[in-house]
Amino acid sequence: MVNQTPTSHAPPGPQLDRIFAALADPTRRALIQRLDGVEELTISELARPLAMSLPAVMKHLDVLENAGLIARHKTGRSVQCRLTAGPMEDAMGWLARYQRFWTESLDRLAQALERQP
């Protein structure tokens, strides 16, 4: 049996690296989760349930914005944050290629085991 790995046209670029690095932190994942299902939240609204300072939350938001996962804009005196779909879709697409690879590999293994006496 030949070992077939997913074909890739190019290695993951720096943007994908930033996305996965941003998602690796539980606080940043919690911030994304808070933004899910709402149009926008202010930085204060995002920070309220977290046990950390506003400057610490803002650093996490900087990482998320740098990865393209959120967008911020100023409305009056407050800064609004919202999710952006594109980067998450890029990450999901990259992961989906490997999901297909592992699913096919495990299916082949199951078939080989079923043929065993």
Residue ranges and their predicted role:
Residues T5-P6, L61, G76:
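Residue-level detector of intrinsically disordered/flexible regions characterized by low predicted structural confidence
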Residues R48, K59, N66:
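Alpha-helical residues within the helix-turn-helix
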Residues M1-Q15, Q33-G37, E89-P117:
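Amphipathic alpha-helical dimerization/coiled-coil segments
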Residues P14, K59-D62:
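Exposed, low-complexity/repetitive linear segments and helix-based recognition motifs
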Residues P14-P55, T75-G93:
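N-terminal helix-turn-helix DNA-binding core of bacterial DNA-binding proteins
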